[in-house]
From Swiss-Prot:
Disulfide bond entries: none
Species this protein is from: Sphingopyxis alaskensis (strain DSM 13593 / LMG 18877 / RB2256) (Sphingomonas alaskensis)
Site (Transition state stabilizer): H179
Keywords, comma-separated and alphabetical: Gluconeogenesis, Glycolysis, Isomerase
Catalytic activity of the protein: (2R)-2-phosphoglycerate = (2R)-3-phosphoglycerate
Name of this protein: 2,3-bisphosphoglycerate-dependent phosphoglycerate mutase
Active site: H9 (tele-phosphohistidine intermediate), E87 (proton donor/acceptor)
Enzyme Commission number(s) from the entry: 5.4.2.11
Complex and partners: Homodimer.
Coiled-coil residue spans: none
Cited function: Catalyzes the interconversion of 2-phosphoglycerate and 3-phosphoglycerate.
Highest taxon above the source species: Bacteria
Gene: gpmA
Protein's pathway: Carbohydrate degradation; glycolysis; pyruvate from D-glyceraldehyde 3-phosphate: step 3/5
Length: 228
C-alpha cells in the first residue's frame, strides 16, 4: 500500500514575528531548519522511504523538503514544484502583525478572516509592497489578490488529482512539503472533514503526517509519524 506523507514547512521568519505571510517568500528560521532536519531523521528512523516529492514554489517549503531529504540521504529523489501548493494568499493582511491587526479590527473580525471557510481577507491593494506581479516564478499566472480556504482548496485539489494521485495509484510513496492551508485542503479531502471543522485543524510545523492509502486512493489511516 502506498503512503502519502505531508509536512508543513519548518518555522519561518514571519511565523516567529507573528506576521501574516501567505504568498510572500520568507525563509525558515534556524529553528525551522532544525525542525526540517529532525523530520528527515525521523522518517529515516521509521523506515519511511518516499519515491517522489512535491512542494510549492515558496522558499520555506522547498528548503524544508531539501533539508529533510538530505537528512534521509535521499536528495536524489525527483521533486516537482508547483504554485498550486502555495500557502493561502492573505491579501491585504500580508505582512501585518497578527496582534496589531486584531487590536485594530477586533479579535472576531480577524478570526473570521483567518478561520472562516469561505470569507477571504480584504484584497491586496494595487501597488502594494507585497505585490508579486513582477516575480518571475509567477509569470503567466493569474495571481490572486486574496483567498479564502475554499479558494485555496479549489486550486490544490485539482492539482492533487492530476499530478499527485497518479503517483499514489502507481504504488509510489509520495512526500509533500507545503503550508498550513494547502495541507488543510488535502487533509479535508482525504479525511472527509467538514467545512466547519477543517478551519479549526492545526497543522504543526515540521511534523510528518502519514496517510496509509488504499488501492482505490481512499485514506485508510492518518497519524503523526512521531506517535508511531
Amino acid at each position: 500500500m502506498p503512503q502519502l506523507i505531508l509536512i508543513r514547512h519548518g518555522q519561518s521568519q514571519w511565523n516567529l514575528e507573528n506576521r501574516f505571510t501567505g504568498w510572500w517568500d520568507v525563509d525558515v528560521t534556524e529553528k525551522g531548519a532544525a525542525e526540517a532536519w529532525a523530520a528527515g531523521e525521523l522518517m529515516k528512523a521509521k523506515g519511511v522511504a518516499p519515491d517522489t516529492c512535491f512542494t510549492s514554489v515558496q522558499t520555506r517549503a522547498i528548503k524544508t523538503l531539501n533539508l529533510a531529504l538530505e537528512a534521509m540521504g535521499r536528495l536524489w529523489l525527483p521533486v516537482t514544484k508547483d504554485w498550486r501548493l502555495n500557502e493561502r494568499h492573505y491579501g491585504g493582511l500580508t505582512g501585518l502583525d497578527k496582534a496589531e491587526t486584531a487590536a485594530k479590527h477586533g479579535d472576531e473580525q480577524v478570526r473570521i478572516w483567518r478561520r472562516s471557510f469561505d470569507i477571504p481577507p480584504p484584497p491586496l491593494e494595487a501597488g502594494s509592497q507585497w505585490d508579486l506581479s513582477a516575480d518571475p516564478r509567477y509569470a503567466g499566472i493569474a495571481i490572486p489578490s486574496t483567498e479564502s480556504l475554499k479558494d485555496t482548496i479549489a486550486r490544490v485539489l485539482p492539482y492533487y488529482e492530476a499530478a499527485i494521485a497518479p503517483q499514489l495509484a502507481a504504488g509510489r510513496t509520495v512526500l509533500i512539503s507545503a503550508h498550513g492551508n494547502s495541507l488543510r485542503a488535502l487533509v479535508k479531502h482525504l479525511s472527509g472533514i467538514s467545512d466547519a471543522d477543517i478551519t479549526g485543524l492545526e497543522i504543526p510545523t515540521g511534523q510528518p503526517i502519514v496517510y496509509e492509502i488504499n488501492d482505490d486512493l481512499s485514506a485508510r489511516e492518518r497519524y503523526y509519524l512521531s506517535e508511531r
